[in-house]
């Protein structure tokens, strides 16, 4: 599982549309679909229900989204702290 896949998952969960999510991520739709499919295979969980016109989160996807958001926020905080320490703005 890659951080990129988690970011892609979170954006798709917000947009519920592959085309809009891909545009927001500045990628094309096929790589987004591929990364989401790989994530689902690795987790052995279907995260989204897909139809020709709709994408919806499964119950498992909604539960996973809560943890993914917390994980991504934690990574962002860790990055900010590391940069602050590196620049002498925080304790070591």
Predicted regions and their residues:
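The N-cap/first-turn positions of alpha helices
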Residues: 2-8, 29, 61, 68
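Short helix-boundary/capping micro-motifs
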Residues: 12-28
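N-terminal helix-turn-helix
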Residues: 36-41, 61
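A short LG(V/I)-centered, amphipathic sequence patch enriched
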Residues: 40-57
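Alpha-helical linker/hinge and terminal dimerization helices associated
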Residues: 42-43, 64-86
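Interdomain hinge and pocket-entrance segments immediately C-terminal to HTH DNA-binding domains
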Residues: 53, 84-92
């Amino acid at each position: 599982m890659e951080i990129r896949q988690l970011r892609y998952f979170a954006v798709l969960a917000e947009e519920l549309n592959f085309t809009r999510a891909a545009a927001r991520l500045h990628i094309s739709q096929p790589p987004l679909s591929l990364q989401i499919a790989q994530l689902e295979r690795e987790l052995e969980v279907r995260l989204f229900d897909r139809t020709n016109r709709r994408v919806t989160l499964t119950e498992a996807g909604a539960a996973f989204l809560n943890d993914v958001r917390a994980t991504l926020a934690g990574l962002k905080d860790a990055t900010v702290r590391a940069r602050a320490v590196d620049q002498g703005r925080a304790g070591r």
